[in-house]
Regions:
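Hydrophobic, small-residue-rich alpha-helical packing segments that form membrane-like cores
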Residues: 144, 152-226, 231-238, 247-249, ...
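Non-catalytic, conformational "gating/processing" segments within enzyme and secreted inhibitor domains
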Residues: 150, 157, 209-239, 451-452, ...
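Active-site recognition of the HExxH zinc-binding catalytic motif
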Residues: 72-80, 84, 307, 558-566, ...
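Bacterial N-terminal signal peptides
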Residues: 5-19
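M16 family metallopeptidases and their MPP-like homologs
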Residues: 45, 50-64, 74-75, 92-141, ...
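Proteolytic maturation boundary segments
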Residues: 22-41, 230-272, 276-286, 290-291, ...
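N-terminal secretory signal peptides that target proteins for export/translocation
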Residues: 1-2
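N-terminal plug
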Residues: 66-69
């Protein structure tokens, strides 16, 4: 009887309002999972976007956490060795085999090692069945037949050392200074995946093989297939290639529970290369693994607290209530398998650390006393539910890599993989449990947590002296805890966007450029390029291309134009504030971005084909009714001034600026002085930004989507045809004047033992470079990049990666080649000499039939994807317009690709790249 009473009481308690039964979450029905007899698990997820493409990932459920003390760095070293020899593919043959398929290392083939996992990734077309089989055979050998030859191991030591060296910068130093506080009592603290360079220098092939055999076993693996592939075919590939792996058992992955560090700590990170001064409060708490409805709600509560804090902080900065800081943020980050951190940060204006501390204390204490309002919570819920509903509507267009990554995360954490529909429906139902009161309780739980630390970041001695002592921070906390603070008043949301369109606007001419490609001229002079994509995406892309950029402005303004553009992006449009615009954009399924470059400005809006009008409204308002919030401008302006003041303290940026000024004899390359920036008002910035689109006749609108022309004409004439000429039109820019003398720049100010090398070679093309020539140069550069990788990375073990990039300036009629790498300081001359020798040899040799074939395969794959991707097709048309003044130039690329010959490529390369006009060499060395 007592047991029955207890049971009835328990059931009644669980059914009380506000209480959740820990019901399991539903797995996405599209996901196929299983396990082979040898223990290997698999996940198959059919996804038809992009068409005929598939991602194949091999996940090893072991990373650096499982290393012994004498193995720190071995997990990462083993990952590198998978590309340096297996039983069937010795030495460099694995990479060569991938390249023979037209796959590129880094883009199509890659791998990474983290604390918890090691993952190998290949992306390739599904139409090439022989290649699919061969890739699966490589995965099989990665799983069981790596060779670890001594010669290859010794060669790779230098590559890994240079990878470690390449990351020695201010960000790395800041991370190292934070780690003892953030990762206290975690295994992560002394198990960075890159490891110890002493281990890298001394580990033997036998030790690498032992680690490999201990962990690379089927029961410690998951194979993930995501893409446009039949699930039965995918399963057959897995079984045919991976079921024969021996059913050996991997060692058991150990678990190190994180212990709370239950006392308040204080940290100051003083680094001259920090871009800002600021103060932050970090909390550490157990990670919420979302396995059931209860944890689903709990994770949403933590996430909403972060979003509510960020939203309120930005609103108060925009309103002018917080003029003493230049910005701030809250975030949640994973710090261990079982632990996370929530932090709240504000950035100081200048070096006013006391003002920053006051601002953060006031924000936190206001929430302590009043919590968040029902209006704020409703706004966040509504916005997030709209995002989730949009995700349901757009699930067929999910990014393939992101989708695969989410599946890998689900596999790693052993959590359900929810479909967009289930996520939306669960959120709509379960978020009713999240109230102002429940968030207040969650907030108080956080604030009472003793596992916390204060962090102050400073970049100069003045700021360091102004940093608060632990006693001062504690006193300030007590002061604000006892201070009666006014509740925050939510300003509400204005979600209307009024557009004054001209009903008289019309199309004055029309021309067919190619199949599914049309050019329209509007009565106001604007040009419209309409393209129908071949895919099934329900996306509409609108890109306004202005032939005005920052080079249209005099030297006294040029470097501030991008800042003005950023201020506009953060201020909203028309009647909508920045926060209201985010909500309006979510409800109308639109996004907007902009970019200012030398000769052009791009304004890009993405909308939906079943509701395109909001996209046209938004681009109209961004051009005709842009705005700059005074407080946003003041904040950005202050940050720019501080960055200029401290430029001498950031050697990498100073080096890049010196190289920029060296390559051009033009005042427009020079940075403005502090007083020039300070004199530039918000009104000046807004006027400058509006001048970028001051004349419709200088704008081309590129519109791409799977939608008929007749459905768009009315929107085009109404919203694009009604854009009027400005009273102060801006002239088109002129190319920067090139420096005519060779030059060398050496800066000895690097704070870490690493050299940064850059070499620019300029070639005078005399005439514009057409598309066939550009393709020939690109084919050559792919072969050159491979030579540089083999000679400098693999044979000389001198650099982790070598960048080789060709660029063409159609206005200046010249070609530039950039060679860049980081290395051991003592070797920079040797490696630069070697790189130039490699280029001379490649110029003399030209490219081979096999190399041309690899290039053609690679480009053809890109073209196949491009035709079906609205975003990529729009970008391609824009590039054709900017590079060749012809929006239809790209339509010839497939035919030109077939017509390419080794002779034509090598002739073009020798014509254009044999004799550089100028060479500019720079090296950044340690002090």
């Amino acid at each position: 009887m007592r047991n029955l009473c207890f049971l009835l009481t328990l059931v009644a308690t669980l059914l009380l309002p506000g209480r959740l039964i820990a019901a399991a979450l539903p797995q996405d029905e599209k996901l196929i999972t299983g396990q082979l007899d040898n223990g290997l698990r698999y996940m198959i997820y059919p996804h038809a976007h992009p068409k005929d493409q598939v991602n194949l990932w091999l996940q090893i459920h072991t990373g650096s956490l499982q290393e012994e003390d004498n193995e720190r760095g071995v997990a990462h070293f083993v990952e590198h060795m998978m590309f340096n020899g297996t039983k069937t593919w010795p030495g460099n043959k694995v990479i060569e085999t991938f390249e023979s398929m037209g796959l590129r290392f880094g883009r199509d083939v890659n791998a990474y090692t983290s604390y918890d996992e090691t993952v190998y990734q290949v992306s390739l077309p599904t139409t090439q069945k022989q290649n699919l089989q061969q890739v699966m055979a490589i995965f099989s050998e990665w799983s069981n037949a790596a060779t670890f030859e001594k010669l290859e191991v010794d060669a790779e030591r230098g590559v890994i050392t240079e990878e470690w060296r390449a990351h020695q910068d201010a960000k790395w130093r800041t991370s190292q200074a934070r780690r003892p506080f953030l990762l206290a009592n975690t295994r992560n603290l002394d198990r960075e995946p890159i490891g110890l360079m002493d281990t890298v220098a001394t580990v033997t092939p036998a030790q690498l093989r032992q680690f490999y055999q201990r962990w690379y076993q089927p029961n410690n693996m998951t194979f993930i297939v995501v893409g446009d592939i039949d699930s039965k075919e995918a399963l057959a590939l897995i079984k045919d290639n991976l079921s024969k792996l021996p059913a050996n058992k991997a060692a058991e992955n150990r678990v190190w529970p994180t212990k709370a560090e239950n006392h308040l700590r204080f940290n100051i990170i003083n680094d001259k290369e920090n871009r800002v001064n600021g103060i932050a409060l970090y909390y550490r708490l157990p990670m919420v693994q979302v396995n059931d409805e209860q944890s689903f709600v709990e994770q949403a509560e933590w996430s909403m607290l972060v979003q509510l804090f960020n939203q309120r902080l930005q609103e108060r900065i925009q309103s002018g209530e917080l003029k003493t800081i230049s910005g701030g943020t809250a975030r949640s980050v994973k710090i261990a398998p079982d632990y996370q951190s929530l932090f709240f940060r504000v950035n100081a204006r200048d070096d006013n650390m006391q003002d920053a501390a006051n601002a953060l204390m006031a924000e936190l204490a206001t929430i302590d006393q009043h919590g968040f309002s029902a209006e704020e919570l409703d706004d966040v819920k509504s916005t997030r539910l709209t995002w989730l509903k949009n995700a349901v509507d757009q699930q067929a267009e999910r990014d393939l890599r992101m989708l695969t990554s989410r599946l890998a995360s689900s596999s790693l954490n052993n959590t359900p993989f929810l479909s967009p529909e289930e996520t939306y429906q669960l959120s709509k139902r379960l978020w009713q449990q999240i109230t102002v009161q429940s968030l207040a309780e969650k907030w108080q739980q956080l604030r009472k947590n003793q596992d916390a630390f204060w962090e102050q970041m400073v970049n100069n001695e003045v700021a360091a002296k102004k940093a608060l002592s632990p006693a001062a921070i504690l006193a300030l906390e007590k002061e604000y805890a006892n201070k009666k603070l006014a509740a925050y008043v939510f300003p509400g949301r204005n979600l209307s966007l009024t557009v004054d369109a001209d009903p008289q606007a019309e199309i004055s001419s029309k021309e067919t450029l190619a199949e599914n490609l049309t050019s329209l001229t509007l009565s106001n002079g604007a040009r419209v390029i309409l393209a129908i994509s071949a895919g099934e995406e329900q996306k509409l892309q609108i890109i306004a291309v202005s032939n005005k950029g920052d080079l249209s402005f005099p030297a006294q303004q040029k470097s501030l134009i991008a800042l003005a553009n950023k201020a506009v992006s953060g201020s909203g449009v028309g009647e909508l504030s920045s926060s209201s615009l985010k909500r309006w954009s979510a409800e109308n399924s639109v996004t907007m971005s902009s970019k200012v470059s030398g000769m052009n400005t791009l304004l890009s809006v993405s909308a939906r084909t079943n509701n395109p009008e909001p996209g046209f409204q938004l681009i109209n308002q961004r051009i005709t009714h842009s705005t700059i919030n005074d407080n946003i401008w003041a904040s950005l302006q202050n940050a720019q001034i501080q960055a200029l003041k401290t430029l001498d303290q950031r050697p990498a940026e100073k080096f890049a600026q010196q190289m920029y000024e060296t390559r051009y004899a033009d005042d427009r390359t020079k940075l403005l002085q502090e007083n020039q920036i300070a004199q530039f008002t918000a009104a000046d910035a807004l006027a400058a930004d509006r001048q970028l689109f001051s004349s419709p006749a200088d704008i081309t609108f590129v519109i791409v989507g799977n939608v008929a022309e007749d459905k768009l004409v009315a929107l085009i004439t109404r919203y694009l045809g009604s854009i009027k000429h400005s009273d102060s039109p801006l002239a088109a820019g002129k190319p920067l004047t090139r420096a005519t003398d060779n030059a060398s720049v050496t800066v000895k100010e690097q704070n870490e033992p690493v050299a940064q090398v850059s070499q620019w070679k300029r070639y005078d093309s005399r005439t514009p470079v057409n598309l066939p020539t550009r393709m020939a140069l690109d084919a050559f550069n792919v072969a050159l990049a491979k030579d540089l990788r083999v000679n400098i990375r693999e044979q000389a073990s001198g650099a982790y990666s070598v960048s080789s990039r060709l660029s063409v300036d159609p206005q200046a009629k010249d070609i530039s080649h950039l060679l860049a790498f980081t290395c051991q300081p003592e070797r920079h001359d040797e490696l630069l000499t070697l790189a130039n020798e490699v280029m001379v040899k490649r110029l003399a040799k030209g490219i081979s039939e096999q190399e041309l074939n690899e290039y053609q395969q690679n480009v053809q794959r890109s073209l196949d994807i491009q035709q079906r991707s609205v975003q990529q097709l729009a970008n391609t048309i824009v590039n054709s317009l900017i590079q060749y003044d012809d929006p239809a130039a790209w339509t010839e690329q497939e035919q030109l690709l077939k017509q390419m010959t080794v002779e034509n490529v090598n002739t073009a390369v020798k014509q254009y790249l044999s004799h550089p006009v100028n060479t500019y060499t720079g090296v950044l060395l340690p002090k």
